[in-house]
Curated annotation (Swiss-Prot):
UniProt organism field: Corvus coronoides (Australian raven)
Gene3D superfamilies hit by this protein: Cytochrome Bc1 Complex, Chain C
Family: Belongs to the cytochrome b family.
Protein name: Cytochrome b
Cofactor requirements of the protein: heme b
Note on cofactor: Binds 2 heme b groups non-covalently.
Transmembrane segments: 34-54, 78-99, 114-134, 179-199, 227-247, 289-309, 321-341, 348-368
Gene Ontology CC entries for this record: mitochondrial inner membrane; respiratory chain complex III
Length: 380
């Protein structure tokens, strides 16, 4: 009998075992589509980013003009830039939904996969931050100044660390050059980490909406989930391309149409929408170091999710108390996002503080309590 090349070729069999013959639970819902959508986002961002890097100049006197030239004079440069800028937004929409799915269905109990995933989120946030600085508009410059300045809150070494990061005594040409280098490098780090993420996932296999072992009922990935992924691609690409073509600046900041000027500060310095929840948590604490620690904790708390799981059931499908808390957490994050976009004044200060407290209270205190109560209710 002839050898099946797909199953025996050293390279093809890796692809086969990951995308064709992979045993997959028969009941995973559309919430499991976001992994492949994130892969699509990453590929889109790397391709458009590479095309942009061919025309971009990482120099303070030329960066803004080079981006402007790209949009005016390069064939479809405006489209490539709009796809890249809005692609970041869709990347974050997908990753937040992906993480939300993981929390709801208890996927964090695959500890290695989850931990690599949190590292991926941190790397993505770093990539988006340094990328936002590159057009060298007002919000790019002041965003970079404010966020890098947070490192100065670290006791003893803070100030030295910030100056080392800047390559001088303020955000200037050396900062822009190194941020471009980081922005070019990190997506490939993300691609590498993604492979590690998938390697760990394929050790245990996917979770499913019921949170029960599915070894007795698996189906091949292709054609069932490959076609489902293609539908997901279409459903994401339609709003993505619509946004990039019809309203490309909807999610951007108008301040960034003004070239960076160290002598005038914008009235409201705020990051892109996908960082606003963390920015609100940062601002809700009056102390600088305290704010920085809260900011770090808002993401790093995800590492604790597997340790805080006390329920006998993996998924929240049959856990009404945890479900109420989960959706309260989602609403709380929306409130934080809104508060982060508002000026620091009454009533936004107190709303931000209450929402920040609620965020940590739900994850660290209320989720475990709900789990214990639900375990007791199982015995009734």
């Amino acid at each position: 009998m002839a050898l099946n090349l797909r199953k025996n070729h050293p390279l093809l069999k890796i692809i086969n075992n990951s995308l064709v013959d992979l045993p997959t639970p028969s009941n995973i819902s559309a919430w499991w589509n976001f992994g492949s959508l994130l892969g699509l986002c990453l590929i889109t961002q790397i391709v458009t980013g590479l095309l942009l890097a061919m025309h971009y100049t990482a120099d303070t006197s030329l960066a803004f003009t080079s981006v402007s030239h790209m949009c005016r004079d390069v064939q479809f440069g405006w489209l490539i830039r709009n796809l890249h800028a809005n692609g970041a937004s869709f990347f974050f929409i997908c990753i937040y939904l992906h993480i939300g799915r993981g929390i709801y269905y208890g996927s964090y109990l695959n500890k290695e996969t989850w931990n690599i995933g949190v590292i991926l989120l941190l790397t993505l946030m770093a990539t988006a931050f340094v990328g936002y600085v590159l057009p060298w508009g007002q919000m790019s410059f002041w965003g970079a100044t404010v966020i890098t300045n947070l490192f100065s809150a670290i006791p003893y070494i803070g100030q030295t660390l910030v100056e080392w990061l800047w390559g001088g005594f303020s955000v200037d040409n050396p900062t822009l050059t190194r941020f471009f280098a980081f922005h070019f490098l990190l997506p490939f780090v993300i691609a590498g980490l993604t492979l590690v993420h998938l390697t760990f996932l394929h050790e245990t296999g996917s979770n499913n909406p019921l949170g029960i072992p599915s070894d007795c009922d698996k189906i091949p990935f292709h054609p069932y989930y490959s076609i489902k992924d293609l539908l997901g691609f279409a459903l994401m690409l339609i709003p993505f391309i619509t946004l990039a073509l019809f309203s490309p600046n909807l999610l951007g900041d108008p301040e960034n149409f003004t070239p960076a000027n160290p002598l005038t500060t914008p009235p409201h310095i705020k990051p892109e929408w996908y960082f606003l929840f963390a920015y609100a948590i940062l601002r809700s604490i009056p102390n600088k170091l305290g704010g920085v620690l809260a900011l770090a904790a808002s993401i790093l708390v995800l590492f604790l999710m597997p340790l805080l799981h006390v329920s006998k059931q993996r998924s929240m499908t049959f856990r009404p108390l945890s479900q109420i808390l989960f959706w309260t957490l989602v609403a709380d994050l929306c409130i934080l996002t809104w508060v982060g976009s508002q000026p620091v004044e009454h009533p936004f200060i107190i709303i931000g503080q209450l929402a920040s407290f609620t965020y940590f209270a739900i994850i660290l205190i209320l989720f475990p309590i709900a789990g214990v109560l639900e375990n007791k209710m199982l015995k009734l």
